[in-house]
């Protein structure tokens, strides 16, 4: 998506060679009209896949996942990183956050992910693939079908997407980055 690439180049901040800050429009401050356009683009790429639910993980994936779900006219559910005391009947998966340097358990209430669903996973970033693997695990636990994943920004050099594609998973990415360093971003 050219508009996204242009925004990344104009507003993104590369920290080291592995971290891309896009907090002016995606991860802290949100540009709602732009989020809706990205959501429509991802929804269009999965049109006809029979999707009945969109799944993401809190927090930065929620805005785009909601935009995708709105375009598909289906509900969105997000995995929580802290299980509420009121939740007992949940699917759980452990993921490792390289950004935060910690493992967390993500949970989804079983009542929001029935076995007859066809799920599209949506997230803001795909790097090592830990969050995506955890969400795939939750979908598998539920017995639901998995249509694939829609990703806003994929860092190809961190190989998470390649590993999941090798397992047969369909992943659609709006902006794929081959490499980056301060002052330079190279798209695929």
From Swiss-Prot:
Catalytic activity as recorded in UniProt: XMP + diphosphate = xanthine + 5-phospho-alpha-D-ribose 1-diphosphate
Binding positions (xanthine): 20, 27, 155
Localisation per UniProt entry: Cytoplasm
Binding site for 5-phospho-alpha-D-ribose 1-diphosphate: 127-131
Catalytic EC class: transferase
EC number: 2.4.2.22
GO terms for biological process, alphabetical: purine ribonucleoside salvage; xanthine metabolic process; XMP salvage
Keyword Transferase on entry: yes
Keywords noted in UniProt: Cytoplasm, Glycosyltransferase, Purine salvage, Transferase
Metabolic or biological pathway, per its Swiss-Prot or TrEMBL entry: Purine metabolism; XMP biosynthesis via salvage pathway; XMP from xanthine: step 1/1
UniProt GO molecular function: xanthine phosphoribosyltransferase activity
Cellular compartments per GO CC: cytoplasm
CDD domains: PRTases_typeI
InterPro entries referenced in this protein's UniProt entry, alphabetically: PRibTrfase_dom (IPR000836), PRTase-like (IPR029057), Pur/Pyrimidine_PRTase (IPR050118), Xanthine_PRibTrfase (IPR010079)
One Pfam family, short name: Pribosyltran
SUPFAM superfamilies reported for this sequence: PRTase-like
UniProt keyword annotation of Glycosyltransferase present: yes
Domain of life, per lineage: Bacteria
SUBUNIT field: Homodimer.
Protein's job: Converts the preformed base xanthine, a product of nucleic acid breakdown, to xanthosine 5'-monophosphate (XMP), so it can be reused for RNA or DNA synthesis.
Assigned protein family: Belongs to the purine/pyrimidine phosphoribosyltransferase family. Xpt subfamily.
Protein name: Xanthine phosphoribosyltransferase
Biological source species: Heliobacterium modesticaldum (strain ATCC 51547 / Ice1)
